[in-house]
């Protein structure tokens, strides 16, 4: 195996659920960020790639995650946050998430069902906006499965780059 073939493999690698772009207009991304380090990377992606684009954030998390720190990093940059809950016993309910994190958000909504939360974001979005669903790999998995049944196949967000 040559260095070139290794570099080529890395450049074309895709990691489902990690900055995975599902559509263009509006841009819809799935990102399994569930810890502060991942939130910082997602925030860097926003700063480097989105400029002043409006961001709608669909967020759901597990009880054992650093929700307060993640929300403190991501929510202030999002124009609207839609709080939801993955269908897992360890998930924080959307209403409790709201109590914990509303002070970080410019605007927030509670939509407990993840599929309805994504639909709400799509209804709120203009073609130029970016929607990100994040906070839990379980949430990303649910939305990815639903999107695959309802929409087009996903495309990589950033060709040739691995994130995390």
Where are these regions (language model features)?
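C-terminal helical cap/extension that packs against the catalytic core
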Residues: 27-29, 68-130
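Nucleotide phosphate-binding/pyrophosphate-handling subdomain across enzymes
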Residues: 1-80
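Short, flexible loop segments at boundaries between secondary-structure elements
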Residues: 86-90, 152-164
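Active-site catalytic pocket residues across diverse enzymes, especially alpha/beta-hydrolases
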Residues: 46, 50, 101, 125, ...
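Active-site-proximal loop/hinge segments that shape catalytic or ion-binding/gating pockets
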Residues: 136
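Short, active-site-adjacent cap segments at secondary-structure transitions
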Residues: 139-141
């Amino acid at each position: 195996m040559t260095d070139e073939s290794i570099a080529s493999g890395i450049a074309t690698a895709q990691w489902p659920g990690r900055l995975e772009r599902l559509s263009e207009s509006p841009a819809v991304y799935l990102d399994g960020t569930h810890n502060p380090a991942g939130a910082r990377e997602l925030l860097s992606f926003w700063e480097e790639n989105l400029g002043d684009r409006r961001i709608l954030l669909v967020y759901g998390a597990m009880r054992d995650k650093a929700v307060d720190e993640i929300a403190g990093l991501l929510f202030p940059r999002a124009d609207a946050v839609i709080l939801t809950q993955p269908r897992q016993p360890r998930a924080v309910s959307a209403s409790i998430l709201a109590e914990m994190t509303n002070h970080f958000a410019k605007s927030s909504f509670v939509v407990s069902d993840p599929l309805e939360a994504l639909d709400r974001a799509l209804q709120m979005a203009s073609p130029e906006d970016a929607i990100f669903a994040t906070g839990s790999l379980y949430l990303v998995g649910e939305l990815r499965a639903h999107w695959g049944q309802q929409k087009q196949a996903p495309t990589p967000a950033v060709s040739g780059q691995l994130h995390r």
